[in-house]
Amino acid sequence: MAAQKDQQKDAEGEGLSATTLLPKLIPSGAGREWLERRRATIRPWGTFVDQQRFSRPRNVGELCQRLVRNVEYYQSNYVFVFLGLILYCVVTSPMLLVALAVFFGACYILYLRTLQSKLVLFGREVSPAHQYALAGGVSFPFFWLAGAGSAVFWVLGATLVLIGSHAAFHQMEPADGEELQMEPV
């Protein structure tokens, strides 16, 4: 009982990220480790969207500096903006949801089938990679009808506009030693 209270206090002290667990659908491995690293290096959203920190750059040199430093500094935040745009695109397109359901349903059926026995076609055993390629081929017409290609380019374009404008107009925090530098006249 006391150990549970200590764990609960530790979780409360760590904030929201301690209580938000990664979904069980993401298998342990490189993908999960990458996502955990992104979550660990995320910058505070309050400073990310602080309207007082937005201004127009004075010249092209400052614009380039802002782009490079903000993309480096807010990289994890930008990844989650990208994932949010993907989620928005999928949720607002019912046909794309159907296409994704068909694809993941076919993959799940193939997964269950390979647990029971090997799939044999024309006397040859079909590898799991070929089975998943077949699932992709079967669901391709659904993705084509759903306009998945345009959805991909919409997400990429919206991401570039949002991230590019944020990185260009968000003022950088002065680095150590940068405050004392004088500009040439």
UniProtKB/Swiss-Prot annotation:
Bilayer topology term: Multi-pass membrane protein
GO cellular component, one term: membrane
Region (Required for interaction with GDI1): 165-185
Subcellular location(s) of the protein: Cell membrane; Cytoplasm; Golgi apparatus; Cytoplasmic vesicle, Secretory vesicle, Synaptic vesicle
Domain of life: Eukaryota
Transmembrane stretches, start-end: 79-94, 95-112, 132-148, 149-165
Molecular function terms, GO-annotated: GTPase binding; identical protein binding; proline-rich region binding
Protein name as catalogued: Prenylated Rab acceptor protein 1
The organism of origin for this protein: Mus musculus (Mouse)
